[in-house]
UniProtKB/Swiss-Prot annotation:
InterPro entries from the UniProt entry: Orthopox_K7, Poxvirus_Bcl-2-like, Poxvirus_sf
Protein name: Protein K7
One GO MF term attached to the UniProt entry: protein sequestering activity
Gene that encodes the chain: OPG044
Subunit structure: Interacts with DDX3; this interaction inhibits DDX3 and suppresses DDX3-mediated IFN-beta promoter induction. Interacts with TRAF6 and IRAK2; these interactions suppress TLR-dependent NF-KappaB activation.
Transmembrane annotation, as ranges: none
Induction behaviour: Expressed in the early phase of the viral replicative cycle.
Protein's cellular compartments: Host cytoplasm
Keywords: Host cytoplasm, Host-virus interaction, Inhibition of host innate immune response by virus, Inhibition of host NF-kappa-B by virus, Inhibition of host RLR pathway by virus, Viral immunoevasion
Pfam short name (any one): Poxv_Bcl-2-like
Family according to the record: Belongs to the orthopoxvirus OPG044 family.
Length: 149
């Protein structure tokens, strides 16, 4: 079990990247990004101190707001903060819902950071492999390649 000190010294491999990683590491990228969103709040880091890749992923917060609406996001974030730590990824069916789901997961772990909950692994929200199907990986890679090139 990792300690808070271990979490504070966590290494984020993609945080400074300005381009998309390989297809094989896209699941690791999303997992790490969601964890990083909590980490920067828990340890009072500068959220803007990152590469273009993470900055592009942060825009998914806006997609989540448009997709779910701010009231629904606040409701989900509060429910997730009170013990219901699972998101049903089967509702992801297109690009917008994929990006909105990534955005809301980031907002949830960020909110946990404000509550001093050091949630160091994204798996507590659900199984990332459920979200990152081959089709969703392709959607995400193509979108990010287009944005970052």
């Amino acid at each position: 079990m990792a300690t808070k000190l271990d979490y504070e010294d966590a290494v984020f491999y993609f945080v400074d990247d300005d381009k998309i990683c390989s297809r094989d590491s896209i699941i690791d990228l999303i997992d790490e990004y969601i964890t990083w969103r909590n980490h920067v709040i828990v340890f009072n880091k500068d959220i803007t101190s990152c590469g273009r890749l993470y900055k592009e992923l942060m825009k998914f917060d806006d997609v989540a707001i448009r997709y779910y609406g701010i009231d629904k996001i606040n409701e989900i974030v509060e429910a997730m903060s009170e013990g219901d730590h699972y998101i049903n990824f089967t509702k992801v069916h297109d690009q917008e819902s994929l990006f909105a789901t990534i955005g809301i997961c980031a907002k949830i772990t960020e909110h946990w950071g404000y509550k001093k909950i050091s949630e160091s692994r994204f798996q507590s929200l659900g199984n990332i492999t459920d979200l990152m199907t081959d089709d969703n990986i392709n959607i995400l890679i193509l979108f990010l390649e287009k944005k970052l090139n």
